[in-house]
C-alpha cells in the first residue's frame, strides 16, 4: 500500500513537472513566436554573402539619416524590425539587421515615409487561446497546488522524522497501546537491584490497591543511570512488555529541531497524549540531550533547549498534575542534568545500573548463550572470571563474535578457541599479520616481558593472563593482566605498582639494549603514568604536599555543562610543587622497574626466547617458568599494557 502511495505521488510530481515544462515552452514561443519564426526566416533566407547582425535603435536612426537604409520590415506590432541596408563602412555590402524598437517610438513610420524608405508592417500572429489559458491561469494554479502538496507530505521538512511541516509541533514519540518488545524480565540478568525496582512499578500498575491501602503513591518518575551498555534501554523494553499499559518511547534529541518553539510544543503534545491514555509509561532515552543543566557551559544556555526543559519540568510536576503518567528516563551523564529535573516529584527514584559483578556476568552469559551451541570445553564461569569490567552489551557482543568466528571456521559449535579469540578481539582489536623476525620484534618481546615481570613480582599488582606478539589494533604487542573484581578502592601501593609495571617495558629496553636504543614504543605508557601520578598528587593527596584535593575530576568539562569557574585555583608555586612531586613519583617508580629487570635478567632472556618461538604465552606457562627463578607473591589489582 505504501508502494502504491509512493508511486502515485511520484507520478503526480512527474506530471506536474512535464505540464509546467510544456506550458513554459509554449509561453516562451508564444511571446517571441514572430521574431523567432517570420523574422528568423527572413534572416536565414538572405544570401550567404550578406552580413547579418543586430543593431541598437539609435544606430538604426543614424543609418536612416545617412541614407544607408534600403528596406524595413516591421514585426510584432512594430516591436521588432528587419532592416536591409548597405554602408560605405563595410564596402557597401548588403546587410540584414535586426533592430528592437523601444516602446513609444511612434514616429518611426513617419521617418520612414520622410526618407522614402520602402517598408512593410507584418501583422502579429494570433495567440492560441489554449496557450493563453495555460500560461496565464493554469500554470500558477498547478505550481501552487504542487507546492502545497509537497509542503504537507515532505519528510525533509520534518527534520527527517517523517512529519510534515504542518505537524512539527506534534510529538514524535512511538506509541504502543499493547507493546510487544520481545523482552521480559526473564531476559535480564546481572542487574538484579534495578530489575527489582521495575518489577515493583509493574506490580503497582497491576495491583494499585495493595499500595494505596497503606497510603503509598506510585513514583512519578524513575531515572536510570549507568555506563553505556549496562541494560538501561533493555529494562525499558522489559517494563513496556510486562506492564501491559500504553507505552510511549522517545529519544531526548527528538524534541529540539531547527525551528524555535518546536521542542516545548512536542513536550506538551506528548504529555497530552499520555494523559489521554493514562495509566501509561513514557520512556525518554538519553534524557541528557534535553535535560542538561541550564545556563552552564561556554556561552551560557541554549534558549530553545532550555525552553524545552522548562516545559518538561512543568509537565512532570507543575501546576497541572498528570496522574497515572510514569516517566522513565535513561542517561549515562547524570552529573550534567539540571537539579530541578532530579528532585523528588519529578524523578522520585534514581536507579543506578552498574557494570555486572562476576555472578551477574555469569547470568548475562547464560541469557545470551541460550540459542548458541557451545562446545564442552567452554566454561561460562571461567569466561565471567576473565571479563571483569565488561558490560552486558560487551558480553553479548563477545558471544556473537565467537559465533561468527565459529561460522567462519566452518564449525557446528562454538569452542573455547573462538571464545578466547573473540575476547582478544574486543579487548585488543583485530589481529594483524605476524611480524617478521627482526630486531624490532625482539625489542617488542623484551618490552612486553618487562611489563609482565615487573607486574608479577609486585604484591599489589594482578596476575598476568597472556603475553602476545600478535599485533592488535594499534599495538605491536600486548600484555594482559587479570583485573580484580572490586577496583573502587585503590591503595597507594597499588597505584605505585601500576606505574612501575607500566614503566617496566621501557626499563627492559634500557637495560637490555642500552639507553641510546630506547624507542618511542613507551610513549602511551609515559602518558598513562604521568596522568596517574598527577592524580595521586592533586586528587588523592598521596604526596608530600599533603591531603589536598587541588583539582576536580570535572575540570575542563565546560562544554559538557560544567561551570567556567571550576578550573584549578592554586598559586604558581603550588603548580611548581605539583610538577616536582609528579616527577619524584615517576622517577622512583622507573628506578624500581629497572631494579626488578636487573634482578631477573636471566629469566627475562629465557621467557623472551620462548615468546619469540610461540608468539603467544599464557599466564600459567609464564608463571611456571618465572617461579623457577624467583618467588612470586600473591596478587591484587588490575591493568592492561600496550606497546604502540
From Swiss-Prot:
Record topological domains on the Stromal side: 1-11, 150-644
Protein topology in the membrane: Multi-pass membrane protein
GO molecular function terms listed in the Swiss-Prot or TrEMBL record: ATP binding; ATP hydrolysis activity; ATP-dependent peptidase activity; metalloendopeptidase activity; zinc ion binding
Top-level division of the source organism's lineage: Eukaryota
Cofactor descriptive note: Binds 1 zinc ion per subunit.
Regions of this protein lying in the Lumenal compartment: 33-128
A cellular-component GO term for this protein: chloroplast thylakoid membrane
Cofactors required: Zn(2+)
GO biological process: protein catabolic process; proteolysis
Cellular location(s): Plastid, Chloroplast thylakoid membrane
EC number(s) stated in the UniProt entry for this protein: 3.4.24.-
Binding site for Zn(2+): 447, 451, 525
UniProt entry keywords in alphabetical sequence: ATP-binding, Chloroplast, Hydrolase, Membrane, Metal-binding, Metalloprotease, Nucleotide-binding, Plastid, Protease, Thylakoid, Transmembrane, Transmembrane helix, Zinc
Function: Acts as a processive, ATP-dependent zinc metallopeptidase.
Assembly behavior: Homohexamer.
Family stated for the protein in its record: In the central section; belongs to the AAA ATPase family.
Protein name: ATP-dependent zinc metalloprotease FtsH
Gene source species: Trieres chinensis (Marine centric diatom)
